[in-house]
Amino acid sequence: MAVSLPTKYPLRPITNIPKSHRPSLLRVRVTCSVTTTKPQPNREKLLVEQRTVNLPLSNDQSLQSTKPRPNREKLVVEQRLASPPLSNDPTLKSTWTHRLWVAAGCTTLFVSLAKSVIGGFDSHLCLEPALAGYAGYILADLGSGVYHWAIDNYGDESTPVVGTQIEAFQGHHKWPWTITRRQFANNLHALAQVITFTVLPLDLAFNDPVFHGFVCTFAFCILFSQQFHAWAHGTKSKLPPLVVALQDMGLLVSRRQHAEHHRAPYNNNYCIVSGAWNNVLDESKVFEALEMVFYFQLGVRPRSWSEPNSDWIEETEISNNQA
């Protein structure tokens, strides 16, 4: 008697496919850099971002496992350009336009100082202009911190008026050592323009010595804040002894204090004149409160809330010199 084929060899659903045979793509974050002996102004970096992608499986229930499956990940490659300035980069050099703007800013400061000193002697006022100057010094440090926090956390290079400064400060987080390579006028000319257009009308409109005591000191600290910032990135052996002494006394922001700003989570020590306000602002969480207000009122998240990415992670000067 013949046995039918289906009866002798019954068909069964496949239920024991090993997990290793199931399709799964793994995607990780990889940073690759290529160095050569020739200068390359536009070095490309390969950035790989990690994302979770659910791959579709067959609807056949016989192919489904009752055990929970781990998230499958996919490899996606995103290419970006990264070009840290070289030590001899022309963008770090001062031009005559830069020097003229710094000279104009310093001239407006000198006029304001002269009006304060001469007006104080003529009015027999010495203490009041001095106290006003001290107030200007203290508030300049606060102002530098608020502005630094704002451009670190909000806006981008397309932001009107301050877009270039936002882009520059983001680059500064990635290559902080470049500020020590900038020439004096190159580092100060942008602030010198602001000071010139702000202080010049005040010089022409007011003669009060107390008022100018505040204006000249506040404007001086704002104009030279970027130089104080550069000194905070310098090494002690290469700084003028007077600068080191002022840093040690707390009159200028110290190297150790500002170094904390360039460490994760990158959300503290924003003030760059004397740094006197840093502890007050950080311990009272003023900036965190402002960030919450902006988020709930405007729906805007600050950059400090995100995990540090390649735009925040510092690259050393050594890797730049090898490129």
From Swiss-Prot:
Residues crossing the lipid bilayer are: 101-121, 131-151, 204-224
Which pathway does the protein contribute to?
Answer: Lipid metabolism; fatty acid metabolism
Q: Which UniProt keywords apply?
A: Chloroplast, Fatty acid metabolism, Lipid metabolism, Membrane, Oxidoreductase, Plastid, Transit peptide, Transmembrane, Transmembrane helix
Q: Which family does it belong to?
A: Belongs to the fatty acid desaturase CarF family.
Q: Which Pfam families match?
A: Lipid_desat (PF10520)
Transit peptide from where to where? 1-77
**One example GO MF annotation:** palmitoyl-[glycerolipid] 3-(E)-desaturase activity
GO biological process per UniProt: phosphatidylglycerol metabolic process; unsaturated fatty acid biosynthetic process
Motif Histidine box-1: list the residue ranges: 170-173
Reaction catalysis annotation: a 1-acyl-2-hexadecanoyl-glycerolipid + 2 reduced [2Fe-2S]-[ferredoxin] + O2 + 2 H(+) = a 1-acyl-2-[(3E)-hexadec-3-enoyl]-glycerolipid + 2 oxidized [2Fe-2S]-[ferredoxin] + 2 H2O
- UniProt motif (Histidine box-3) ranges: 258-262
**Which phenotype arises from disrupting this gene?**
No visible phenotype, but missing a chloroplast-specific phosphatidylglycerol molecular species that carries a delta 3-trans-hexadecenoic acid in the sn-2 position of its core glyceryl moiety.
Q: Where is this motif: Histidine box-2?
A: 229-233
> What's the entry's take on its domains?
The histidine box domains are involved in binding the catalytic metal ions.
Function noted in UniProt: Fatty acid desaturase involved in the production of chloroplast-specific phosphatidylglycerol molecular species containing 16:1(3E). Catalyzes the formation of a trans double bond introduced close to the carboxyl group of palmitic acid, which is specifically esterified to the sn-2 glyceryl carbon of phosphatidylglycerol.
- Compartments it resides in: Plastid, Chloroplast membrane
| Gene Ontology CC | chloroplast; chloroplast membrane
Topological category with respect to the lipid bilayer: Multi-pass membrane protein
Q: Say which species the protein is native to.
A: Arabidopsis thaliana (Mouse-ear cress)
Enzyme Commission code: 1.14.19.43
Question: Organism's domain of life?
Answer: Eukaryota
Q: Which cofactor does it need?
A: Fe(2+)
Protein name per the record: Fatty acid desaturase 4, chloroplastic
